[in-house]
């Protein structure tokens, strides 16, 4: 659970960093650039912590995809950037792609878990058979 929180914080810091970059480029402020560097560095650190337990493909897709979604929304609200029908379609496809990646990872994780359980069961049967043979010999 904590790794998902790391991922959420990585997304938030990435969005703050990217929006700070835009703000600094519009206002010419040095503070915005400093905030950008700190937030983006923090974002990568948190992402690295998240991928210890969250699948890399899922983590990166969420980090980048959700980040783009929020950056687009805030850019329209705060920087008066346009939001065309084409951009809305792209964002919808992005969300769909993230959902597909996430659902595909769950199935792969379940399959991998099933394989591990099967291997453990086979090993247990092997050990039990060996011990049973030794008891019969005695």
Swiss-Prot record:
InterPro entries: Small_drug/metabolite_transptr, Small_multidrug_res, Spermidine_export_MdtJ. GO terms for biological process: glycine betaine transport. It is found in: Cell inner membrane. Pfam families: Multi_Drug_Res. One of its GO terms (cellular component) is plasma membrane. The keyword Transmembrane helix applies. Forms a complex with MdtI. This is Spermidine export protein MdtJ.
């Amino acid at each position: 659970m904590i790794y998902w929180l790391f991922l959420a914080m990585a997304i938030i810091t990435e969005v703050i960093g990217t929006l700070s970059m835009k703000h600094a480029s519009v206002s010419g402020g040095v503070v915005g650039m400093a905030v950008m560097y700190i937030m983006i560095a923090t974002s990568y650190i948190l992402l690295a912590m998240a991928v210890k337990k969250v699948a890399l493909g899922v983590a990166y897709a969420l980090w980048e995809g959700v980040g783009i979604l929020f950056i687009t929304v805030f850019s329209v609200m705060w920087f008066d950037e346009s939001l065309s029908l084409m951009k809305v379609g792209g964002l919808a496809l992005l969300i769909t792609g993230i959902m597909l990646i996430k659902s595909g990872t769950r199935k792969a994780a379940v399959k991998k878990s099933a394989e591990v359980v099967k291997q453990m069961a086979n090993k247990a049967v092997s050990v039990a058979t060996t011990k049973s043979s030794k008891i019969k010999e005695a």
